[in-house]
Amino acid sequence: MQWNKSGFLVPAPGSPPGASFAQHCPFSPEAPNEDAIAGELFPAAPFADARIGRFEAAYVGHASEQPFRPNGSSGGLTSWVAAELLRTGVVDAVAHVAPTDPESGRHFAYRLSCSLEELNAGAKSRYYPVELSQVLGEIRATPGRYAVVGIPCFIKAIHLLKRVDPVIGDRVTHTLGLFCGHMKSAAMVESFAWQLGTELARVQALDYRIKNESRPANWYRTHLDLAGGGSAEQDWWHLADGDWGAGFLQNPACDWCDDVVAETADIAFGDAWVEPYSSDGRGTNVVIVRTPKLKALIERGRADGRLILEPVSADFIVKTQAAGLRHRRDGLAYRLSWHRSGIRAVKRVTPSAALPLRRKLVYRLRYAIARWSHPMLRLARACRNRAIYTLWARSALRLYQSVAWSRGRFGRLLDALLPPPERLS
């Protein structure tokens, strides 16, 4: 795999896909969808919901056992479950994303952790392009039982690969999913560095979400460690491209995904983006458990007092992810209705343009921002003038927020002409 011009990892030239590629690419129209895969994996699940899939139980809460909650971006439950699988001998190693030396050309990468110390060093959210080829090679080379942590499309890809690769099928025994809004380009790090008054080459490490117990959990703040011992940090909302919902530097594939909550994972974790949890700076998870064995593991943690969890309904989970689900349901249906040449995505959402005009404008603007942010950043880099990108991004953000949030004079004018959209965040 190698970087493309937009900061995404793509197959290197001379690496043609194999004959079975169309059957195990998660975005291929020829591959089974999430419903089909989950139906095979969790046939006896007592609950099935069109929005969050099949499941055994759902919870909201956090890990009370140290150091999982303080070390994580949210409630610490992803790391706790991965650690519990390791220390009870259920798996021999966990494949997860961890920081790496930027001299390698990447700030984060998948690795295999065989100890709790290694696992804890990889805690926290990483909105950075990664790929699985190296760890899959290590799994093929070393017999054992492995858990894989990943976003929905990665977990789906693992299950599709298990169908055609018997070694992976035998050795990957557990999948831990992460809820996903969309993924960002590696260029996001460069943009943040520019806006914090430094250069990408000086960034030695970064934290996309610093945890501060005195601030609401949804007040994202990024932190950069710089060469020479310095650092820089800033709240996302002060950054030109810091509005997550606007889609700056988004991976194009994310506009054609309909799985927010990792419906094919054995267990999946997200942030509890509803009050009172979103105001709790310590972080709170929502969890969807899809297998009886992992439900038993969770219940043992609750009984021991190591987990503080309350059972919740599918409707509660949906409320915590309302914005992402709208974008992957109503928004995806609208995008699927557009005329496009080439391969057309086949999704579980029916194409439809039956939306109010104002909401159509919101989705069109998100799509345009996601597409144009990449060439604008490249232009700024080529001209050695970061203002080309940041001024464009701030202008695009003002237009987007006027349409989506009725902000500014133009937003008020639009309100007089068109009913404001449902709050989309």
Map each language-model feature to its residues.
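Non-heme iron-sulfur electron-transfer modules
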Residues: M1-H62, A109, V274-Y277
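N-terminal, charge-rich interaction modules
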Residues: Y59-A82, G89-V94, L357-A370
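Portal/gating segments that form or line small-molecule/metal binding sites
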Residues: G72, L77-L86, V90-R140
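Gly/Ser/Thr-rich loops at beta-strand to alpha-helix junctions
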Residues: G72-L77, D101, V148-I158, H182-K184
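Long, compositionally biased charged/polar accessory segments in the mid-to-C-terminal portions
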Residues: V91-D92, A201-S425
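A short alpha->loop->secondary-structure connector
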Residues: V164-G177
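Short, conserved secondary-structure transition motifs
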Residues: F179-S191, K211-R215
